[in-house]
């Protein structure tokens, strides 16, 4: 007989104590976003540099009005999965607009970015296949790859030579191959070399999935990272509605038969309630703003570059600037110091980032003023020199 298990509560208590000892325990902190930049937390108003609402559209009057009007006419929730009665016409309209923006034949929306990659990859990959994943790709890509049952192979970050070598070693025995990467990496803000990755994937008869969650609305004139690499063949262009669009959910753009199969067989589409119509309406209004306001689209990167210039860091490629501090304790101390100064920059710790690379992940918004960026740079300087 095996030894009796601890109670579930005792097991959890031990796990939490171990995390606490490593400064890795997470705690929720109630936070209200009062506008596109500032938050209320612990009774204080803080300028936030930890929100992915890159264009400030979650609080844009046109976006809120569109969502409110949809609630009035369509109700709050979808009521069922899309294959039952949840396929509100606003969802198809949003999919057509996303596909047109991305230059794809069709699109499918999802409940979240995590659900998207958790569902997409197992739809196309399985036992006998290989999935090659950038080592710094988002957790949802890793989750979908592992869930698929395919052999999952990590390649060094943005290292096309390493990708080529690993494809060469494994491709011959595999039925199908998929290369999966972030477009803009969520914790570092750098951009994948998609032209070279695409050429390598094609040379080894592999499909390419790109997660453009942090590119849409920010890079490539708002179209996303694919617009920076027009020659790249991206078979599955996935992204979110929850970052620059200021809404919630996700999408994937691809060829029409690919999308048809996703809508028929992907478990995170078939077996879950559809996105609320109001979310689709708000996202549609946000797309209009991205298309018609190029200065707003350019602003987050300009703010990020002002910050990197002030701190003597490499020029920002996106709206994200990592301030890598090393151990978790230092990152937590730096975050607390900034919060005392009225600035919110949440510490990011393992396992979200690799060991010894705990950091403050700075997310710049179109609504940040230059003086707010300068205040942040001044507050960060002592930690850069420590």
UniProtKB/Swiss-Prot annotation:
The modification N6-(pyridoxal phosphate)lysine is found at residue 243. It catalyses: 6-carboxyhexanoyl-[ACP] + L-alanine + H(+) = (8S)-8-amino-7-oxononanoate + holo-[ACP] + CO2. GO terms for molecular function: 8-amino-7-oxononanoate synthase activity; pyridoxal phosphate binding. Pathway: Cofactor biosynthesis; biotin biosynthesis. InterPro entries: Aminotrans_II_pyridoxalP_BS (IPR001917), Aminotransferase_I/II_large (IPR004839), AON_synthase_class-II (IPR050087), AONS_Archaea/Proteobacteria (IPR004723), PyrdxlP-dep_Trfase (IPR015424), PyrdxlP-dep_Trfase_major (IPR015421), PyrdxlP-dep_Trfase_small (IPR015422). It is an enzyme of class 2 (transferase). Its EC number is 2.3.1.47. It comes from the Bacteria. Keywords: Biotin biosynthesis, Pyridoxal phosphate, Transferase. Its cofactor is pyridoxal 5'-phosphate. Disulfide bonds: none annotated. It holds the Pfam family Aminotran_1_2. Homodimer. Catalyzes the decarboxylative condensation of pimeloyl-[acyl-carrier protein] and L-alanine to produce 8-amino-7-oxononanoate (AON), [acyl-carrier protein], and carbon dioxide. This is Putative 8-amino-7-oxononanoate synthase. It comes from Phenylobacterium zucineum (strain HLK1).
């Amino acid at each position: 007989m095996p030894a009796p298990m601890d109670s579930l509560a005792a097991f959890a208590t031990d796990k939490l104590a171990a995390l606490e000892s490593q400064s890795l325990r997470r705690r929720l902190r109630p936070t209200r976003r009062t506008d596109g930049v500032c938050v209320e937390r612990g009774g204080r108003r803080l300028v936030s540099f930890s929100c992915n609402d890159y264009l400030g559209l979650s609080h844009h009057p046109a976006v809120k009005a569109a969502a409110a009007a949809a609630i009035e006419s369509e109700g709050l929730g979808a009521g069922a999965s899309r294959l039952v009665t949840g396929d509100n016409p606003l969802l198809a309209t949003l999919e057509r607009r996303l596909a047109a923006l991305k230059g794809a034949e069709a699109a499918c929306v999802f409940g979240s970015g995590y659900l998207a990659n958790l569902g997409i990859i197992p739809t196309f990959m399985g036992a006998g296949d290989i999935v090659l994943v950038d080592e710094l790709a988002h957790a949802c890509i890793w989750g979908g790859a592992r869930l698929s049952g395919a052999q999952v192979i990590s390649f060094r970050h943005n290292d096309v030579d390493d990708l080529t070598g690993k494809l060469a070693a494994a491709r011959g025995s595999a039925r199908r191959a998929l290369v999966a990467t972030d477009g803009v990496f969520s914790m570092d803000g750098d951009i994948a070399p998609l032209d070279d990755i695409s050429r390598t994937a094609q040379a080894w008869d592999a499909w390419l999935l790109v997660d453009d969650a942090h590119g849409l609305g920010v890079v490539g004139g708002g179209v996303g990272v694919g617009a920076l690499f027009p020659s790249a063949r991206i078979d599955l262009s996935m992204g979110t509605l929850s970052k620059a669009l200021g809404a919630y959910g996700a999408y994937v753009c691809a060829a029409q038969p690919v999308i048809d199969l996703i809508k028929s067989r992907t478990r995170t589409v078939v077996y879950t309630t559809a996105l609320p119509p109001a979310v689709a309406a708000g996202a549609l209004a946000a797309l209009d703003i991205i298309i018609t306001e190029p200065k707003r689209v350019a602003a987050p990167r300009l703010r990020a570059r002002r910050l990197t210039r002030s701190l003597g860091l490499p020029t920002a490629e996106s709206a994200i600037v990592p301030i890598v501090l090393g151990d978790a304790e230092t990152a937590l101390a730096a975050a607390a110091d900034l919060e005392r100064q009225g600035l919110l920059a949440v510490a990011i710790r393992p396992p979200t980032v690799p060991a010894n690379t705990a950091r403050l992940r700075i997310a710049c918004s179109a609504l940040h003023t230059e003086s707010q960026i300068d205040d942040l740079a001044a507050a960060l300087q002592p930690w850069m020199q420590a």
